[in-house]
A protein has these predicted regions:
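Catalytic domains that recognize anionic headgroups
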Residues: 1-374
């Protein structure tokens, strides 16, 4: 009965979001601008756990292209605030922390912030409309695009190209919501990206684990291709200062141990669901204009963070200040607070320490292996 009541309450608050957030303003102001055009890309990945990225030490070549990008900034200690898309992505689009979850229904999100700061804003999604808080926050963007099947993420880059070729705006924010590594994994990439084989569509069972992992790793390899090509495109733009921030919404279980857990969104978490891939890239013109932000990002590569940092990092990348924004939560700020407590939003919408999310000794060993302290 408690869960039914909570679900009903969430539905009502989501339904009334337009009313409860109507008068909210960030009172946004820009403290600096770059000469020429400014383009900011905020890319939300799907189910991309860090353990299966070559950039994080994985022994398979799942990042053959990004591994060749010398000016990439890889954040190595980022945990998701929720192991479900419908909770994680709203937090990624919002300034709200898990400790103040009720504020989610009263504050607007990243598109509204950039609108106030004078940007042209786009939300381009490779997922279906959610009919929930993701839509409420995302639909403040001035332009919305939902991609139809086959829903390969490279189609997002096609849309980015069209926007930047056609738009006359000098200040643009593009938020991309990827399909990434959403199950079924073998459907997330064209067949020419089936590098690890066999990757057949099989029943979920321990005896099929290798095929499932092969397909999952192929999806990560395709994400690698998408991100690398996106960076190449941004790099090619003349007279443009650009910055890109990527992070997955949550991780994934792949029948990793004796628990034989698969997928995500379970009431209790695992290290595999919590530890996510996140990275940033800055164009040469951006680096010249904002060397202190780039230096801070590089200094914070190993800083402990959660997906709460993403909103504040993106705002700070664009030199936007205002209500509810914090430099102490921005990974491109020398003021970033490495000592801030990290909290997870549990099934009851309570902020709890990660150690109290049902983690077992095998999870703590995984975190130890990656140098992560909870």
């Amino acid at each position: 009965f408690y869960n039914l009541g909570l679900s009903g309450s969430e539905f009502r608050k989501t339904h009334h979001f337009e009313r409860t957030s109507r008068d909210f303003r960030f009172e946004a102001r820009r403290t600096a601008e770059a000469p020429g055009r400014e383009v900011y890309l905020y890319i939300i990945g799907e189910a991309a756990r860090a353990m299966n990225w070559q950039l994080y030490g994985y022994d398979r070549e799942t990042n053959p292209e990004l591994s060749q990008v010398d000016d990439l900034v890889v954040f190595r200690d980022v945990l998701t605030q929720s192991n479900t898309t419908h909770k994680s992505v709203p937090l990624i689009l919002s300034s709200v922390n898990t400790d103040e979850h009720e504020e989610l229904y009263r504050r607007k999100g990243l598109p509204a912030l950039f609108n106030e700061a004078g940007f042209e804003t786009w939300f381009i999604s490779n997922q279906s409309r959610q009919g929930a808080m993701i839509d409420n926050l995302a639909h403040d963007a001035q332009h919305l695009i939902y991609i139809r099947s086959p829903r390969y993420d490279m189609q997002l880059l096609d849309e980015v190209r069209k926007v930047l070729e056609r738009s006359r705006s000098q200040k643009i924010l593009l938020i991309l919501h990827c399909y990434g590594s959403h199950f079924s994994y073998h459907q997330r990439y064209p067949r020419e990206f089936a590098h690890f084989k066999p990757d057949d569509d099989v029943a979920i069972a321990a005896q099929h684990r290798q095929m499932l992992v092969n397909a999952y790793d192929n999806s990560i390899r395709y994400t690698d291709h998408f991100l690398a090509r996106t960076i190449d495109y941004l790099r090619s733009l003349d007279d443009t200062s650009s910055a890109l921030l990527y992070c997955a919404d949550h991780g994934e279980d792949l029948i990793d141990d004796r628990r034989e857990r698969f997928l995500h969104a379970s009431p209790t978490t695992t290290a595999y669901q919590l530890y996510v891939a996140s990275l940033a890239w800055f164009s040469e013109r951006y680096r010249e204009r904002f060397p202190e932000k780039v230096a801070a990002a590089e200094a914070n590569e190993a800083a402990p963070a959660t997906t709460h940092a993403l909103f504040h990092t993106m705002a700070d990348m664009a030199s936007i200040e205002g209500r509810c924004l914090s430099k102490e939560a921005s990974l491109v700020s020398p003021e970033y607070d490495r000592t801030a407590p990290r909290r997870y939003l549990n099934d009851h919408n309570e902020a709890v320490p990660y150690r109290k999310t049902g983690l077992l000794p095998e999870d703590m060993e995984v975190f130890r292996r990656y140098g992560i302290s909870l």
